[in-house]
Swiss-Prot record:
Record-listed E.C. numbers: 2.1.1.-
Biological pathway: Antifungal biosynthesis
Family assignment from sequence similarity: Belongs to the methyltransferase superfamily.
Record's protein name: O-methyltransferase
Entries under InterPro entries matching the protein: Erg6_SMT_methyltransf, MeTfrase_dom, Methyltransf_11, SAM-dependent_MTases_sf
Binding site for S-adenosyl-L-methionine: Q100, H145
GO biological process: methylation
Function summary: O-methyltransferase; part of the gene cluster that mediates the biosynthesis of the tetrahydropyranyl antifungal agent lanomycin that acts as an inhibitor of CYP51 and blocks the ergosterol biosynthesis.
Lineage: Eukaryota, Fungi, Dikarya, Ascomycota, Pezizomycotina
Keyword Methyltransferase found: yes
Superkingdom to which the source organism belongs: Eukaryota
Molecular function terms from GO: S-adenosylmethionine-dependent methyltransferase activity
Length: 267
């Protein structure tokens, strides 16, 4: 088995600086996979699937009007803008990509000016935010990038008020399954350290001040993203296209790769 690197926040930020535009092109403006209700017959567009994934996270977060919500790994702001406008909340989005901040601030300038949205550079493992300053948080495919997940979850817990919810959507690896060489190119391309199991993530949450309320594995419902990536790889061509297609093939065939929707409460 090849050794999996432990990317730093700087490494992850550089990757997103370079690949965000491609990712948002693939995923209809979002930087997360979609949720297909019928993965065996995925006729839904990537637009509908990514919006449904956002809704799955939102339904578990249950924000109320006037609340201040933290978006951990905000990408270019599409998820934050959607939630802020539909639920009358204010959102602070953090990312380690300067390019993402620039795009988010420009795209949602009107919402930024009204104070509904704020985008800033911040590492979740060292959050420069005040204690108990948020009413909820969500993290969509961002915890997976962090080389110290305990530190990240501890920091998120610190900035949440007691009783607040944390809604997570992320990749996991089945318990006892070694991280296979088959997805080594995925780890390298997307700057992801060794994956952990859903049970390990729940354990970390419990140890860092959360009570897990729900955790469901929806791995089959995200599988069609591999076809989307393969198609984009054909369109892009070159080395990038070849890598995208290779990643898609590796992920599609890896049954041990899970994807969870989890919600926890700050105790």
């Amino acid at each position: 088995m090849s050794k999996i690197a432990q990317p730093t926040a700087t490494d992850v930020g550089a990757m997103y600086d370079n690949h965000t535009d491609l990712m948002t092109d693939i995923m209809a403006g979002f930087i997360h996979v979609g949720y297909w209700e019928d993965p065996e017959n995925p006729t839904e567009t990537i637009e509908l699937a990514t919006e449904r994934m956002t809704l799955e996270v939102l339904n578990r977060l249950r924000p109320s009007p006037g609340q201040h919500i933290l978006d951990v790994g905000c990408g270019t702001g599409k998820t934050a803008a959607s939630i802020a406008t539909t639920h009358d909340v204010s959102i602070t989005g953090i990312t380690v990509s300067n390019h993402q901040i620039e795009v988010a601030r420009k795209t949602y300038e009107a919402l930024v000016e009204t104070g509904k949205l704020n985008f800033q550079y911040a590492d979740a493992m060292q959050l420069p935010l005040a204690n108990a300053s948020f009413d909820g948080a969500y993290a969509i495919e961002s915890i997976v990038h962090m080389n110290d997940r305990r530190a990240a979850l501890s920091n998120i817990a610190r900035v949440l008020r007691p009783g607040s919810r944390l809604s997570i959507a992320d990749l996991v690896l089945d318990d006892g399954c070694p991280d296979p060489d088959a997805i080594a190119n995925w780890h390298e391309l997307f700057q992801v350290p060794a994956l952990i199991s859903a049970d390990k993530l729940k354990e970390l949450l419990t140890e860092t001040g959360f009570r897990v309320l729900e955790c469901v594995d929806i791995r089959q419902h995200i599988r069609p993203i591999c076809g989307v990536m393969d198609k984009k790889g054909l369109q892009v061509g070159g080395e990038v296209g070849k890598t995208l297609r290779g990643v898609a093939a590796s992920l599609h065939g890896l049954e041990e790769l899970g994807y969870i929707l989890l919600v926890a409460e700050r105790v």
